[in-house]
Amino acid sequence: NEGDYIATHWTPTDSNLEGAIKSGKYADGYGYDLRVLPRRNLMLTSSFTGWSNYMMDFGKMLSDPEAMKHFGNTVVQWNLHTKQPKKVFDVPGAPLEIRCAWGENHNYCFTSTALTSKIWLIYEDKAGEWQAKEVADVGEPSKIPLPVDISIQSDDKMLWVNTFMDGKTRAFDISDPFKPKQVFEQKIGAQVNMVSSSWDGKRLYYTSSLLANWDKKGADNEQFLKAYDWDGKQLKEQFSIDFTKEKLGRAHQMVLNAYSLYSANEPAPSENLISKVTLK
C-alpha cells in the first residue's frame, strides 16, 4: 500500500462548486469510480457513498434513516488535463461503476445506480455538451436488486450488469445506447459483484465480494471466482474457485486477459479528436 502523494482535486459541493456548473439539485461531494475518454478531454467520477456507510453492517445501514441520507446522487464531468470540475449531473440513487464505450467515435459512458436500479447514459450531444439521461431499469427496481459492477463488450454492443442481492447477471443490447434492451439473465451465485468481459467477448469472469461489512451472512456468504463461456445466447460455466475452501479470503476484483486479444477488433477511424497522443 505504498505510494507517492501527487495531488488533491476536490469534488464539487453545494458550499463550494470548485468552479463547476450545477445542472440539477445535487452537488454532494462524494467520490467513487473514475473513467476517462482522453480524446474528448473527459474525466467522469461517480458518487456512491461515504466512509461511515462503508464501516456499517449492510443490514443495519439499510434500516438506518440517517445512513440512507448519506448516499451520492451525482456524476461529475471534469477537464481531464487540468482536473477542473466542469459540470455536476443529477444521477439519483447512488451511482457506482462507470464504463465508457470502446469505439473511437462512441462518445458516451454508462453507469448504474445501486438504490434505484437504473442504467444511466452519460453522452456528448451534437453541440459538444455532455448530458446525463436515465435509459433503462435493471430488474425490478422496487425489490432493490442492487446493481453493482458493469462491463461493456469491446464491440460496444452488449452491457453486462450484475445485481448483488439476487446474485444475477444481465445482458443488455446497447446497439442503441439510448435504448438498452435486456436480452439475457442468469443467476451466478447467492451474491455476485464484479464482472469482466474478455476482449473477444467470448468469456465472462465473475467474483462475489462487495466488501466485508456488506457481504451476506452464513451460507449466502459465497466467495468465488467463476469463469463462463459466452456464445451469444447462453453462459456455460468453465471453472469455479471457492475462495472460502481455499482460504483465499474475499474475492472482489479480477483482471484476466491476453495481450494478443487486443488486436481482435479493428478500431474505427477517429473523428473530431480533441486530443491525440502518438507513442514512439
Give names to the regions the model predicted:
Residues 26-42, 92-108, 139-157, 189-199, ...:
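Beta-rich, blade/repeat-based domains predominating
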Residues 17-24, 84-89, 131-141, 181-186, ...:
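A short beta-strand motif characteristic of beta-propeller blades
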Residues 1-38:
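Asp-box/WD-like beta-propeller blade repeats and closely related beta-sheet repeat scaffolds
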Residues 1, 46-70, 207-225:
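Short, conserved, GDST-rich strand-edge loop motifs in beta-rich repeat architectures
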Residues 195-280:
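Blade-level signature of beta-propeller repeat domains, shared across WD40, Kelch, NHL, RCC1
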Residues 107-113, 117-119, 141-225:
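Loop/turn-rich, solvent-exposed surfaces of beta-rich toroidal or solenoidal domains
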Residues 4-14, 62-82, 220-232:
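Beta-propeller blade signature
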Residues 9-16, 77-80, 121-131, 171-180, ...:
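Short loop/turn segments immediately following beta-strands, especially the blade-tip
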